[in-house]
């Protein structure tokens, strides 16, 4: 049999009280039972024996009062009680700043107590849950407030508690995260309580009972009983007893404090269906609240964090993991790196790796080349055959390089002359300097064919020149000393210039014999 608080509609109460588990146990009220031919009621995929429609709020059974989920996570009872008191004080203070009715603040505190009898303070932040409870209570009591206002009020209370200068809350990523946490906590409260979140308060019951006792005109008695009832919201009496019993206990305590006599033959509370033992237990629980010290928020937060870390360590230890998430070595069957017969750290000095030998030989060759480059003969030793070959190769390269570089200043000089003469002289000088270029066959025909052959010779010489540049190996280019090459280039520049002048004079004389009339003008222009 499931029971729940006062529903908004009959259909909602039927579905809520039957489909979702309630935090309470047995309750009295109007009960309607519907039985099918199979002996139960099928709602969804679950079979229920009966559906109870009641206006009474749920009461937590005695077996769930101790141990609580927080105590099972390692939190002691005094710390849990202080956290409950502190959370209810936050809800009460925030409700005053939000200008909520007292009924809404009372509903939020009752929801706070109910939730933490199902969940642990170690796993859930009591401040976030307090925000969610007061936000949910404002909706239940038809006085809704925005989540932004709730967060701002709790931020202000936190600053006052820390004795800091009040400052507005910055709307940054932390605010967005807090807002999302409050929304998720509100859903969690609804789910955990089975959406049975309506609370029957004893506020109106107190006024009604005092009218029966003809004490409603005593405003001091009414206000004192009302105050005791509001203070008892910080305790767990609202989840343990019926609202009628709580109203009788508040009137009993106020009349004793003000020394106002009430009927005793028979006792007045027997008229309302309560017992003296329950009234005395509620009074003791309420008066104990005034003897407790004010809870320290910082110490409670540290205690909760400590228990949270211990719980996390216990979970990781049960899974065989370290604190950083890595697997523990003790769970790997006694594995130890030192237990191996031969460790890779132990390397014999006599043994040499073939890789290291190859590296040494590779490193030795550039050292020999560097030592050879420091010699006055361009790094060539006379007593080896390899050094002779490298010297001859370096000389031929230096000559070829100097010749190719010597064309650079002449190129600007030849631009002043005719284009055909420049191309022909340049192609012939380059073809003579490169031994790899093929021998030219002069065609003594028309000047157009000569120009065509001249362009072909220029292309072939350029192509062979590129091939020669690409064929040079990297090792030969490293052996050439830059300073010696520049000195040779300066020394031999005049010599090669003379050779080019002689070659051009020879060409002019050779052409003059065969083409005296056609090329004579160009020859005079060169001179």
From Swiss-Prot:
Location of region: Disordered: 1-37, 327-527
BP GO annotations: regulation of RNA splicing; regulation of transcription by RNA polymerase II
A cellular component annotation (GO) from this entry: cyclin-dependent protein kinase holoenzyme complex
Region of interest called Cyclin-like 2, as start-end residue ranges on this chain: 204-288
Tissue expression remark: Ubiquitous with higher level in liver; expressed in striatal neurons.
Subcellular location: Nucleus speckle; Nucleus, Nucleoplasm
Region span, RS: 391-433
A family per Pfam: Cyclin_C
Region (Cyclin-like 1): 89-191
Biased composition (Basic residues): 383-419, 439-453, 461-477, 487-499, 510-527
Keyword field: Cyclin, Isopeptide bond, Nucleus, Phosphoprotein, Repeat, Transcription, Transcription regulation, Ubl conjugation
CDD domains, per the entry: CYCLIN_CCNL1_rpt2
Modified residues (Phosphothreonine): 326
Conditions for induction: By anisomycin (activator of MAP kinase pathway) and by dopamine and cocaine in dopamine D1 receptor-expressing striatal neurons and by EGF/epidermal growth factor or NGF/nerve growth factor in PC12 pheochromocytoma cells. Isoform 1 also is specifically induced by cycloheximide, potassium chloride (KCl) and forskolin or brain neurotrophic factor (BDNF). Isoform 2 is induced by glutamate.
UniProt feature, compositional bias: Basic and acidic residues: 343-353, 362-371, 500-509
Subunit relationships: Interacts with POLR2A via its hyperphosphorylated C-terminal domain (CTD). Interacts with CDK11A, CDK11B, CDK12 and CDK13. May form a ternary complex with CDK11B and casein kinase II (CKII). Interacts with pre-mRNA-splicing factors, including at least SRSF1, SRSF2 AND SRSF7/SLU7.
Similarity field: Belongs to the cyclin family. Cyclin L subfamily.
Function: Involved in pre-mRNA splicing. Functions in association with cyclin-dependent kinases (CDKs). May play a role in the regulation of RNA polymerase II (pol II). Inhibited by the CDK-specific inhibitor CDKN1A/p21.
Domains: entry comment: Contains a RS region (arginine-serine dipeptide repeat) within the C-terminal domain which is the hallmark of the SR family of splicing factors. This region probably plays a role in protein-protein interactions.
Protein name as catalogued: Cyclin-L1
């Amino acid at each position: 049999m499931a029971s729940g608080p006062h529903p908004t509609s009959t259909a909602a109460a039927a579905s809520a009280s039957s489909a979702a588990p309630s935090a309470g146990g047995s309750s009295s009220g109007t009960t309607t039972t519907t039985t099918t031919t199979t002996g139960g009621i099928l709602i969804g995929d679950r079979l229920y024996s009966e559906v109870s429609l009641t206006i009474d709020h749920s009461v937590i059974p005695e077996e769930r009062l101790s141990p609580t989920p927080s105590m099972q996570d390692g939190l002691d009872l005094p710390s849990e009680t202080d956290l409950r008191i502190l959370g209810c004080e936050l809800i009460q203070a925030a409700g005053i700043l939000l200008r909520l009715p007292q009924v809404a603040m009372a509903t939020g505190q009752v929801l706070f107590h109910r939730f933490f009898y199902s969940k642990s303070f170690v796993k859930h932040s009591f401040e976030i849950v307090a925000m969610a409870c007061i936000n949910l209570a404002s909706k239940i009591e038809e006085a809704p407030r925005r989540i932004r206002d709730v967060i701002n009020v709790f931020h202000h209370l936190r600053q006052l508690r820390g004795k800091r200068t009040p400052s507005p809350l910055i709307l940054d990523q932390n605010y967005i995260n807090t807002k999302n946490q409050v929304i998720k906590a509100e859903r969690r409260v609804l789910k955990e309580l089975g959406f049975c979140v309506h609370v029957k308060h004893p506020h109106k019951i107190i006024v009604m009972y005092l009218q029966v006792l003809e004490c409603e005109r005593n405003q001091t008695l009414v206000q004192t009983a009302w105050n005791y009832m509001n203070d008892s919201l910080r305790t767990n009496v609202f989840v343990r007893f019926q609202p009628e019993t709580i109203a009788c206990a508040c009137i009993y305590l106020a009349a004793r404090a003000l020394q106002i006599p009430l009927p005793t033959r028979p006792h007045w509370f027997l008229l309302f269906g309560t017992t003296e033992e329950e009234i005395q237990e509620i009074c003791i629980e309420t008066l104990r609240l005034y003897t407790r010290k004010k809870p320290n928020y910082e110490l409670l937060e540290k205690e909760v964090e400590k228990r949270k870390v211990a719980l996390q360590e216990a979970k990781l230890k049960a899974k065989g993991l370290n604190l950083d998430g890595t697997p523990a070595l003790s769970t790997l069957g006694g594995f130890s790196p030192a237990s191996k017969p031969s460790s890779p750290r132990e390397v014999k000095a006599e043994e040499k790796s073939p890789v290291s030998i190859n590296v040494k030989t590779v490193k030795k060759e550039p050292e020999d080349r560097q030592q050879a480059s420091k010699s006055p003969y361009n790094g060539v030793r006379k007593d080896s055959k390899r050094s002779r070959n490298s010297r001859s190769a370096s000389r031929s390269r230096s000559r070829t390089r100097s010749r190719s570089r010597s064309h650079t200043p002449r190129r600007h000089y030849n631009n002043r002359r005719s284009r055909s003469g420049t191309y022909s002289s340049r192609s012939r000088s380059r073809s003579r300097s490169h031994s790899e270029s093929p021998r030219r066959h002069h065609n003594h025909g028309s000047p157009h064919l000569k120009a065509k052959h001249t362009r072909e010779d220029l292309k072939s010489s350029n192509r062979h020149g590129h091939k020669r540049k690409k064929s040079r190996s990297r090792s030969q280019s490293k052996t050439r000393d830059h300073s010696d090459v520049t000195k040779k280039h300066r020394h031999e520049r005049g010599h090669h210039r003379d050779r080019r002048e002689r070659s051009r004079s020879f060409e002019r004389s050779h052409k003059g014999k065969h083409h005296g009339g056609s090329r004579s003008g160009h020859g005079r222009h060169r001179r």
